[in-house]
Swiss-Prot record:
It is found in: Secreted; Host cytoplasm, Host cytosol; Host endoplasmic reticulum lumen. Forms a complex with SubA with the stoichiometry SubA1:SubB5 (called SubAB5). Each SubB subunit makes different contacts with the single SubA subunit. This subunit alone forms pentamers. Keywords: Host cytoplasm, Host endoplasmic reticulum, Plasmid, Secreted, Signal, Virulence. Residues 1-23 form the signal peptide. This is Subtilase cytotoxin subunit B. It comes from Escherichia coli. Changing residue 102 to E: In strain: O29. Changing residue 38 to A: 50% toxicity of holotoxin on Vero cells, SubAB5 complex about 60% less stable. Changing residue 92 to D: Poor localization to host endoplasmic reticulum lumen, nearly complete loss of toxicity of holotoxin on Vero cells, too little SubAB5 complex forms to test its stability.
Length: 141
């Protein structure tokens, strides 16, 4: 390998390692988490020729959260089928879960007004209202 090729390859590798487009992970954010939630509502539909589903969940204290997933939309769209199957299972069984969501993703006004702007980004099982498996999204103090 010539010196020129070496520096070209090293430069390319250096640029790739500095790329800010890192993997999106459910545990990255510091907000958007409700624990000990029972999914009480389930809705499916289609928008812009893409299927979507939405859930609403309630905590025992009465707080509620809604979130939606849309196939092949947003960075979380690739998880649509997995999230759909898990959400439907948890809705059917009534098992308490932790709902991870990203606020403000959906922006179409009629959709947001009727459902939510929150994107569903993950689900975890819970053994109590506060003890759940998976990342714990705590806001920075």
């Amino acid at each position: 390998m010539t010196i020129k090729r070496f520096f070209v390859c090293a430069g390319i590798m250096g640029c790739l390692s500095l790329n800010p487009a890192m993997a999106e992970w459910t545990g990255d954010a510091r907000d958007g988490m409700f624990s000990g939630v029972v999914i009480t509502q389930f809705h499916t539909g289609q928008i812009d020729n893409k299927p979507y589903f939405c859930i609403e969940g309630k905590q025992s204290a009465g707080s509620s959260i809604s979130a939606c997933s849309m196939k092949n939309s947003s960075v979380w769209g690739a998880s649509f089928s997995t999230l759909y199957n898990q959400a439907l299972y948890f809705y059917t069984t009534g098992q308490p879960v932790r709902i991870y969501y990203k606020p403000g993703v959906w922006t179409y006004p009629p959709f947001v007004k009727a459902l939510t702007s929150n994107a569903l980004v993950g689900l975890s099982t819970c053994t109590t209202s506060t003890e759940c498996f998976g990342p714990d999204r705590k806001k920075n103090s």
